[in-house]
Amino acid sequence: MNFIQFNHAPCIIYDFGNNSFLLFSNLRCSITSELDTCTNNRSLKIVKLNNVNSFENCVSLKYADLRRWNTENITDLSSCFSFCQSLKKLRIENWNTSNVEDLSHLFSTCSSLRSLNLSRWNVSKVQTMDYCFSGCTELRRLNISNWNPCSLISMRQCFSKCKSLRELTLNWTTSHLRNMSNCFAYSNFETLNLQNWRMNNAIDFSYCFFECKNLQTLFTPDSHVRKLESCFNGCESLIALNLSNWNVDHVHKFNNCFKGCKSLAILDIRSWNINSRAHTNGMFNGCDKLDIVFCTEDTFYKIVEQFPNSDEWVWENNEARKLDEE
């Protein structure tokens, strides 16, 4: 296909079938120079486009205006723009995504992209968002405020390495969600409010907020948790954390859960029932400012050895407190 001709093509109906992942992917070197922009603004009705890796690895693509594409039949957008490292502007805000089930790796490593408005997308059938925005290191504005991913099951590393995003509105219904491992890892969010999320299933929170060094405020929903390894490891700006609405009855590994939370002073885990066989190694390593932990007596005696200066702690009336230095 001549891509210059494609950019100026009249109204066309395309049936790309199940081989659509070959559409533009991996265009490099001299060929890619023909695809530094893609601006087909004429009516392009795609009657069958089920597996869309279309622009994956188009490393020279800088601008794409695909607003006129008819995407109503698409079920899979995985890796569509992944590794488009030069992409700075993308116009797909009006795409019909009502049948899409897979958004994994959609914008993964779009490291030049600065703004995305996807608020009009219907994501009600989406089941996986693994790595969706991972590696979008320059992304400063992301509007997904109207999303309601009510079928979502997994969002592993969804926002990992989003180093330029400071805030994000996520008023979601997530009653089927099971996996949030590394979801916000290595990002620079200052505030995250997940309080309205519904989490009816046991969630994998391992490494979820790993190395979120700027995270100061976190609101979490009622949750049944199954994995907590290194969940808050490296959250060095958190001062207070309320996790009293988490059920951890089935968690077996708490290793390094709060490691490196060097500003954390108050922790509320009063509802936690930690299994006597659970691994808690390194749970509070580096939490040198921790003074108060709201917890049951049973929990206190299971984790007190992991507290900094553990011999200086006492428990009374559902509160573990570090003794004042004389």
What role is predicted for each listed range?
Residues 19-21, 52-54, 73-80, 99-107, ...:
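Consensus positions within tandem repeat domains that build extended binding/scaffold surfaces
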Residues 24-25, 259:
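Acidic, Ser/Thr
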Residues 2-17, 27-50, 60-73, 86-99, ...:
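Structural signature of tandem-repeat unit edges
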Residues 1-3, 325-326:
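Universal eukaryotic N-terminal targeting presequences
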Residues 277-282, 304-307:
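A short acidic (Asp/Glu
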Residues 304-326:
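C-terminal capping region of solenoid repeat domains
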